[in-house]
């Protein structure tokens, strides 16, 4: 791995995607940046985003929502096209945070017909700080299969995996990249709700995690439900589906069984990897994670990112 001779900091003027919301100092900062690959899972059908609701959206946002195109959701109100001095797609903010966190290249996992993402990031939206690649997941059969789709891109290098509809603080990205092996951040459920601003009941749909006294992942529980979190309390640890992997995850993604929900799911593949002897390190993370999975999320994301200028 190439260790860049600097400490994580924002060096350009103005507010960036790395500085949205509140980021607790001293938790994931002062981390030497590491050149890292990242895989963005953008193949989802966007079923929840497509559902009609009473959220007030601009015409461009309404079109993106109807198409389930969460990552291409225009942030901010404007009549100008994306990237032409007007609104920026949500993915620009995600890419900006990845670049600030030390990533040097990104692979989008997309559907065969996802031309909008390819056209934008190969054209006017091409990042200046990141190399862009694409991998096609032919069928929307789960996040484990999505990761498998990026095997050629990852090669034998370590890489990050994250959702395209979540915006993670750049210091968390930097600390994740700086781990010495596979791992993930651990968020306290109550703190995550308070800092991120999404509805409290949403956290019950996230994956819960158990760790040992050395901070190693023991097990991950996909969508355990309200009863689990009621018993675990405010300090229950959850995964926000952002990971550092090495090439061993591909065998686990291949071997993972079909879930009761009819998909090959990445958290279950991590369970397979654990059973195969892979050690996953964890670290306690804080700071807002913005979630753009529903129409009702758009207003909060707009507010949190007001004045932010992404520079991917």
PLM regions with names:
Residues 1-9:
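Extreme N-terminal basic, low-complexity initiation segments
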Residues 12, 16-19:
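Serine residues within intrinsically disordered or low-complexity segments
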Residues 33-67, 74-161, 261:
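Conserved N-terminal catalytic core of the sugar/cofactor nucleotidyltransferase
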Residues 33-34, 38, 220-312:
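Conserved alpha/beta core of the MobA/IspD/sugar-nucleotide pyrophosphorylase nucleotidyltransferase superfamily
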Residues 164-167:
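The conserved acidic donor/metal-binding loop of glycosyltransferases
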Residues 169-252, 256:
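Conserved core of the sugar-phosphate nucleotidyltransferase
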């Amino acid at each position: 791995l190439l260790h860049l001779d600097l400490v994580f900091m924002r060096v350009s003027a103005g507010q960036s995607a790395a500085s949205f919301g509140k980021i607790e100092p001293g938790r994931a900062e002062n981390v030497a940046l590491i050149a890292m690959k990242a895989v963005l899972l953008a193949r989802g059908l966007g079923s929840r985003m497509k559902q009609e609701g009473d959220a007030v959206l601009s015409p461009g946002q309404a079109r993106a929502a109807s198409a389930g195109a969460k990552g291409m959701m225009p942030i901010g109100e404007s009549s100008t096209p994306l990237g032409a001095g007007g609104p920026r797609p949500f993915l620009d903010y995600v890419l900006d945070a990845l670049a600030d966190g030390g990533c040097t290249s990104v692979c989008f996992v997309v559907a065969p017909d996802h031309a909008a993402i390819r056209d934008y990031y190969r054209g006017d939206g091409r990042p200046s700080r990141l190399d862009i690649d694409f991998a096609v997941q032919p069928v929307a059969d789960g996040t484990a299969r999505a990761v498998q789709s990026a095997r050629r891109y990852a090669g034998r290098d370590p890489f990050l995996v994250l959702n395209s509809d979540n915006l993670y603080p750049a210091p968390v990205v930097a600390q994740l990249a700086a781990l010495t092996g596979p791992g993930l951040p651990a968020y306290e459920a109550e703190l995550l709700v308070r800092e991120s601003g999404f509805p409290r009941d949403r956290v019950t749909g996230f994956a819960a995690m158990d760790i040992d006294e050395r901070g190693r992942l023991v097990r991950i529980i996909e969508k355990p439900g309200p009863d689990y979190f009621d018993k675990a309390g405010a300090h229950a640890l959850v995964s926000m589906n952002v990971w550092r992997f090495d090439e061993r995850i591909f065998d686990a993604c291949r071997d993972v069984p079909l879930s009761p929900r009819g998909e090959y799911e990445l958290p279950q593949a991590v369970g397979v990897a654990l059973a195969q002897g892979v050690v996953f390190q964890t670290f306690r993370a804080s700071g807002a994670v913005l979630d753009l999975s529903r129409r009702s999320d758009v207003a909060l994301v707009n507010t949190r990112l007001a004045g932010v200028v992404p520079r991917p």
